[in-house]
Regions:
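Phosphate-group recognition and catalysis centered on beta-loop-alpha active-site segments
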Residues: 1-224
Length: 224
């Protein structure tokens, strides 16, 4: 495991599953991450035209927007979110709400469907982390259900506005890209009492440096 011998070992979440073993964001990748001993799994969720939640990173599948496809036309290798969460059990899961066009309303539809799906599952609400680059999606989720942990994704400098926004909104965590993480960010997060979920940690040398800077959770392409 990438950080098995590091000090201040964070919780390790497999980025889209263990896709060194299987195709990313597939049932096989999620099962491989469970077998690899990951602490959790990160995956991406999108909504189809007929309101089904599927796990896929990119906006298109075979040059067609997921949001314009009906579920029966989704390829078999793209899992439904329900099947994906079943494959991830018993690990914690970070569900990223993908937002490509904030004005389209897709993010709100996705969050509403996500809340309906999660609230009837047997796992405790603490099992889920809902993340997004779009704070409006996170705010809508909190309006619908205040029990889920929320994380704001951040990948560009300066990171300070994202940190300030996450703190002011009362989110559980900031999810910075690993290239942004330094002592200043870590100290700022600690002072604000907000968690850091760092993505996507894959280089062992960089991992050693990040271990010094700290982080509550790492999302990594190398869970094993």
């Amino acid at each position: 495991m990438l950080c098995g011998k590091l000090p201040n070992k964070p919780a390790v979440f497999a980025h889209r599953g263990d896709w060194a073993q299987e195709r990313e964001n597939t049932i096989g990748a999620f099962r491989a991450a469970v077998e690899a001993g990951a602490d959790g799994i990160e995956l991406d969720v999108r909504i189809t035209r007929d309101g089904r939640l599927v796990v896929h990173h990119d906006p298109l599948i075979e040059q067609v927007a997921v949001s314009r496809m009906t579920y029966p036309n989704i390829p078999e290798w793209v899992p439904s979110l329900t099947d994906a969460l079943d494959a991830c059990y018993p690990l914690r899961v970070n569900i990223e709400v993908k937002v490509d066009d904030a004005a389209s309303g897709l993010a709100m539809r996705t969050v509403e469907a996500l809340n309906e799906l999660l609230r009837v599952r047997a796992e405790a609400p603490e099992n889920w982390v809902i993340s997004s680059f779009d704070s409006r999606a996170l705010d809508h989720m909190r309006f619908l259900n205040s029990n889920f942990r929320l994380g704001l994704l951040c990948w560009k400098k300066p990171w300070q506005p994202s940190m300030e926004h996450a703190v002011s909104k009362g989110y559980s965590a900031l999810h910075p890209h690993e290239g942004l993480v330094d002592a200043e960010l870590s100290e700022s997060a600690s002072a604000a009492g907000i968690e850091r979920c760092v993505w996507a940690v894959s280089d062992p040398k960089r991992a050693r440096g990040l271990a010094t800077a700290g982080g509550t959770r790492w999302i990594t392409d190398m869970p094993a």
